[in-house]
Amino acid sequence: MCMTNDSRNYFQKRPNTHEPTLGPGISFMNQRSNNKTQRLQQWFDERPRWDHASYGEFMHIGANQTIFRIALEEQEISTETKVLDTACAVGGNARWMASLFGCQVWGNDIDEEALVVARDLAEIENISELCTFVEAPVEALPFDDNTFNIVVTTDVFDSNEVKRVLKPGGSFIVISLFEDPKITPVQLAERWGLELETSLDVTDLAFAFNRAKETEARLLHESDLIGARELIDIMNKSVAPYTNGGRHYIMRLRKK
């Protein structure tokens, strides 16, 4: 299992000591909104990590639409394509692909609260019939062998399970930080038993993005929206892996 960027920290529940709001005089109370932006804001108001909020529904440098479009370059996707977004959180990638291509998508995660949000957002976007979100760990996917044409992930996955559920000739698209500076995409492909089709080093972009998160965290701290401990936590985990030599790769691999 790859879990390289401490990407599970946002699943630690923060006590909800205040009523979720968008601003002065604007309150959601405790009711779920049928507005996409408001529903996401409700979710982020309950999260312990403010640094994830400005990622929006994609929650990760490797899961924004620009980067994801690069990863999908030359990928043939139709309404018949079956896609798994493993460790999907609120399902940003899965829902985006369903909306754009009309394909059937599945997402798995261990956080049922995140999956509730994913289902709510799929309903708001009128794509519920294309999306299925299930509670399951990456190392025990509840799917048959050779099920999916495409598996996508950002950081958290189990390579053996990915290979098992992929159809022969299917694609595994991974966008992830690898903290070992000596490891290469070719070596990773060999380790996972997959054929490397393409790779792109996006470390500079990821570093700049996470540096911006540090600046944002300082502004939040100055505005008394986060405490000193949270600020230090964000600063320690944003760019440190990159300054220590970590590399961020986009890779597309194929099951032989």
Residue ranges and their predicted role:
Residues 139-150:
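A short acidic, Gly/Pro-enriched loop at the edge of an enzyme's catalytic core
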Residues 202-256:
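Conserved Class I S-adenosyl-L-methionine
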Residues 7-76:
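Conserved class I S-adenosyl-L-methionine
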Residues 181-192:
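Short alpha-helix
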Residues 89:
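Conserved glycine-rich SAM-binding loop
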Residues 84, 92-139:
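Class I SAM-dependent methyltransferase SAM/SAH-binding core
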Residues 159-171:
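A short glycine-rich, Lys/Arg-flanked "PGG" loop and its adjoining helix->strand segment in the class I
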